[in-house]
């Protein structure tokens, strides 16, 4: 049997797929790492995996960033044992909202910085998680007292992730 008759994808497609898979593995690793961290407050983690979504958006485009965010939540949740639990639902809602917000900001706000994109993603992530928790799990008015500090922490986290994304992107562009 001649193996030359099998179709081969172009090299640039293989490189793109390999880059996406490397980013996915990094995002999953950060998802698992963050799950082991003690929270900085109720429902708050630093959002390091969203940094990888932002890098995927910058380096590969919106479809790859969105699919990376989805794959990261599903596979990461499988590995930490939260797949199809309330934690998974909250994580999926927040991760998808962050990815969509970052894509929208990147596309429709001319001249926005990576920090700005990351800030909007972090705020969308937190607000969506908060709305998900409030609508599906905890219907208590007192829950709203937690929102201002959570949004403040999200802004800090979004700023740090945006700055890190800028640094990493500059290093990658320098080496490419």
Annotate the PLM regions:
Residues 2-12, 18-26, 68, 90-124, ...:
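Short helix-perturbing small/polar motifs within transmembrane alpha-helices
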Residues 48-64, 101-105:
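Generic transmembrane alpha-helix motif of multi-pass integral membrane proteins
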Residues 2-56:
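Hydrophobic transmembrane alpha-helices
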Residues 85-89, 104, 108-176:
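Membrane-embedded alpha-helical hairpins and interfacial helices in multi-pass inner-membrane proteins
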Residues 30-46, 71-100, 137, 142, ...:
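Interfacial aromatic-anchored transmembrane helix boundaries in multi-pass membrane proteins
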Residues 21, 25, 29, 55, ...:
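Generic alpha-helical transmembrane segments of integral inner-membrane proteins
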């Amino acid at each position: 049997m001649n193996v030359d008759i099998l179709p081969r994808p172009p090299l640039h497609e293989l490189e793109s797929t390999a880059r996406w898979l490397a980013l996915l593995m990094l995002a999953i690793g950060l998802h698992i790492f963050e799950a082991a961290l003690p929270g900085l407050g109720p429902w708050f983690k630093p959002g390091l995996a969203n940094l990888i979504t932002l890098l995927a958006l910058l380096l590969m485009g919106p479809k790859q960033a969105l699919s990376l965010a989805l794959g990261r939540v599903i596979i990461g949740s499988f590995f930490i044992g939260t797949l199809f639990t309330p934690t998974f639902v909250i994580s999926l809602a927040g991760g998808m909202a962050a990815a969509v917000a970052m894509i929208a900001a990147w596309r429709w706000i001319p001249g926005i910085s990576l920090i700005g994109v990351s800030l909007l993603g972090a705020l969308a992530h937190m607000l969506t998680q908060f709305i998900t928790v409030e609508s599906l799990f905890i219907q208590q008015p007192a829950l709203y007292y937690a929102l201002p500090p959570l949004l403040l922490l999200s802004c800090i986290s979004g700023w740090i992730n945006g700055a890190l994304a800028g640094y990493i992107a500059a290093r990658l562009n320098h080496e490419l």
